[in-house]
From Swiss-Prot:
The gene is RNF148. Residues 1-34 form the signal peptide. GO terms for biological process: ubiquitin-dependent protein catabolic process. The keyword Zinc-finger applies. The chain crosses the membrane at residues 186-208. Residues 65-167 form the PA domain. SMART domains: RING (SM00184). A zinc finger (RING-type) spans 256-297. This is RING finger protein 148. It holds the Pfam family zf-RING_2.
Amino acid sequence: MSLLRITSSAHSSASSRLWRLGIFLLLSLPDSKGKAIWTAHLNITFQVGSRLISELGESGVFGNHSPLERVSGVVVLPEGWNQNACNPMTNFSRPGQTDPWLALIERGGCTFTRKINVAAEKGANGVIIYNYPGTGNKVFPMSHQGTENIVAVMIGNLKGMELLHLIQKGVYVKIIIEVGRMHMPWLSHYIMSLFTFLTATVAYLFLYCAWRPRGPNFSTRRQRQLKADVRKAIGKLQLRVLQEGDKELEPDEDNCVVCFDIYKPQDVVRILTCKHIFHKACIDPWLLAHRTCPMCKCDILQT
């Protein structure tokens, strides 16, 4: 019974831990509304001398609040020494009043929303923001609430500085921004969490199935084997038939501590390994139930 209780308790504890793990993993998963990241393909065209150069690359990412649309235009810089376009009075050097244009703006100095609004108010078709110096070509999806009507993408600092230098040299640069691929960075976390939970579930079910049918049978077999070992040990214990003159029959000797009767001639007694004696009819059932001497607790299976 003790083994069964332990096994049942172990299963209950494991089940409880597995349930708590599942809840933790589910709560740790990202919100189903988590945004995907959309890359931006930039088709860059400019002329150097008589050569027309065209570059196509997955150079940027769309902002979180940007429409996912194709947009094109000549690339224009903010006027003045500061390229962050944080001042609402910032103007842009447009080549022609009717040509569509894209603002190339440096990150920093104010929020993305403010930069984008400044360019949008001046008539930009879209906004390209390049990252801080020292960040290489690292990009991330910008947050710019309130500017959902204009395309906004981020490109790396290296690519941004390359475009900046071309335009500052008077090179006419045109860019077509197209929607690239969708990435879901939270998906790997979701898959890993799901895999961990499923692995734990399968492991628990395997152990549960392995132990559940085995537990009761194992306990029963163990008890049967123990009884058989006790019977075998009892059978090896010495027997005597008391005769007149034996010291056990003397008045000052102890009685049988199991039945409390005095010993009489012709009584059959069992002598344990600890040398204590008892009526055979009394001690054999006792040993089957307890397997120890009633007086000194000596275990007959350990001697």
